[in-house]
């Protein structure tokens, strides 16, 4: 899988699963790269590629490729760190106030 193919797939999975990720209550609402993907999709990606995919994902986040994550909180460059989205209510209120 190339970097662009992976980033396109990640964007598709984020769009598809963002609502589920925002509702997440386990682990204080935090999630890992594997949580973004559907279980079946993530299992189809060879384990040996996971760390490289994490590097690509983190770099893309820091460049603003996934604004819903970059905007949500300060992210760390390491793929295994957790990312946290703002609750939906805060997003709606914040947008209305601005």
Label the predicted regions:
Residues 35, 55, 59-98:
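Charged low-complexity interaction tracts in eukaryotic proteins
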Residues 41-56, 69-70:
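Short, positively charged loop/turn segments that connect secondary-structure elements
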Residues 27, 39, 50, 75-78:
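Generic hydrophobic/packing signal
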Residues 2-30, 39, 43, 62:
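Positively charged, polyanion-binding regions of nucleic-acid-associated proteins
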């Amino acid at each position: 899988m190339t970097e662009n193919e992976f980033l396109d797939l990640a964007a598709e999975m984020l769009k598809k699963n963002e609502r589920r990720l925002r509702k997440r209550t386990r682990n204080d609402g935090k999630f890992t790269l594997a949580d973004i993907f559907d279980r079946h999709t993530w299992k189809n990606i060879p384990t040996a590629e996971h760390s490289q995919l994490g590097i690509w994902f983190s770099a893309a986040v820091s460049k603003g490729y996934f604004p819903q994550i970059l905007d949500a909180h300060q992210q760390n460059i390491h793929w295994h760190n957790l990312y946290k989205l703002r609750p939906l209510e805060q997003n709606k209120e914040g947008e209305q106030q601005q």
